[in-house]
Amino acid sequence: MRKLLYIALLIAVAACTSKGVDQGEVAARAAKQYYDYLLQGDYASFVDGHFRHDSIPDTYREQLIANAKMYMNQQTVEHRGIKDVHIVQVKADTEKHAANVFLVFAYGDSTNEEIVVPMVENKGVWYLR
């Protein structure tokens, strides 16, 4: 939860320092931060980055955390892990408070994979959808 507040603070600072904040860029940075949590093994923060994370039962939240850990273990077996995440592009619809962020995973076996991360903005914070 503290990390979500940190992200909200970053968004607020960006909003105060510039009139025309690019919400697509904010969504992209938030998506990258959530995936950085995943790479760092902070699975709870990754799960908490999903929209409406606070309205799910604790048992389901624990299952999501376990799934994130299993996913990272699978990537280690198949690709020698995810070594880095890069933002490639973002397409934002500010009227609908939504964005699609395109990220590239750089794997330990020198392969790359581009993924699309749907994001949604709620009360000034961008969440994974």
Identify the meaning behind each predicted range.
Residues 28-29, 33, 44-94:
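Short solvent-exposed beta->alpha transition segments
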Residues 16-40:
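Short, low-complexity N-terminal intrinsically disordered segments enriched in polar/charged residues
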Residues 1-18:
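Sec-dependent bacterial lipoprotein signal peptides
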Residues 86-129:
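Exposed beta-sheet edge and beta->alpha loop/turn motif
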Residues 7, 22-25, 110:
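Residue-level detector of secondary-structure boundary/capping sites
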Residues 41-43, 124:
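Loop/turn elements at helix/coil->beta-strand transitions in domains of secreted/extracellular proteins
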Residues 2-3, 33-37, 96-99, 117:
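Solvent-exposed, well-ordered amphipathic alpha-helical segments
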